[in-house]
Amino acid sequence: MIVDGRVSKIVLASIKNNIYKVFITVNSPIKFIAGQFVMVTINGKKCPFSIANCPTKNHEIELHIGSSNKDCSLDIIEYFVDALVEEVAIELDAPHGNAWLRSESNNPLLLIAGGTGLSYINSILTNCLNRNIPQDIYLYWGVKNSSLLYEDEELLELSLNNKNLHYIPVIEDKSEEWIGKKGTVLDAVMEDFTDLAHFDIYVCGPFMMAKTAKEKLIEEKKAKSEQMFADAFAYV
C-alpha cells in the first residue's frame, strides 16, 4: 500500500549520539502488524525502516534513526528535516516484513535488540502490553555505551508497572562504570538462559548479530527455528 505522509515532528532522542525519532502523519491509515516495516522513498530510492509504534496508532508512523558520520545516515536525517521544514509530502510503502508478532502464541517472549533495532522491538512490546498478555516478556537491549540507551528511563518505568516485563540493558564498553550487564547483548542472553525451546524470540539489530543469535540460540539453547523471527533471517 502506497500512501503519502508528512513529517509532523522530529525528536532528538540522544543529543550525544544523534539518535532521532521521526513522526510521519499519513493521509490514509496504514494497516500493519507489530514488527513490520515501512519503505520510505528518499531521493528516488526506497529505504526500509522498522515501524516503532503500535498498530493501533496507524494514522502516524514513528521511526527511530541513528545518524552516524556515514554520508548515507546524514543524508537520511537531512531528508526528513527538509521535509518537515518545507512541509512537503513523502511517499511511504507499507506494510512489509514477515517477522511480525505472532499474537496467537501463548509462549513467553524473548526480545533482543541491538542499537536502534529497538524500534522494531518497541512496536512488539507496546502491542503486547496494550493487550495485557500474561506471559513473561524478556527484553535485552544491547548498545556500545550507556549514552546510547535513549529509551532507558521509559523501559525501566514500563518494567516497574508491568510485572511480567523483565528489562535488561547491556553495554559493550567494559571500561564504563555500569551496575548492569556488560558485553554483547547475545553474551547476556547466553548467560541467562539454558533452555529456550518454549520461547518466541524476536531479534533486530546489525545483520551479523541476528545471524549469530539464530545459530547460537538454536545450537546451544534449544531455541526452535520456527519460533525465531527477524527480517535478517530471510538472508541467513
Swiss-Prot record:
Any one GO molecular-function label of the UniProt entry: oxidoreductase activity
Binding locations of pyridine: 114-118
PROSITE patterns with a match to the protein in the record: FAD_FR (PS51384)
Pfam families linked to this entry: NAD_binding_1
Domain of life per record: Bacteria
Enzyme class label: oxidoreductase
GO biological process entries: bioluminescence
Domain named FAD-binding FR-type: residues: 1-102
Keywords: FAD, Flavoprotein, Luminescence, Oxidoreductase
Enzyme nomenclature, EC number: 1.-.-.-
InterPro entries for this protein: FAD-bd_FR_type, FNR_nucleotide-bd, MRET, OxRdtase_FAD/NAD-bd, Riboflavin_synthase-like_b-brl
Family listed: Belongs to the Fre/LuxG FAD/NAD(P) flavoprotein oxidoreductase family.
Function statement: Probable flavin reductase in the luminescent systems of different marine bacteria.
Protein name per Swiss-Prot or TrEMBL: Probable flavin reductase
Species of origin: Aliivibrio fischeri (Vibrio fischeri)
Gene it is expressed from: luxG
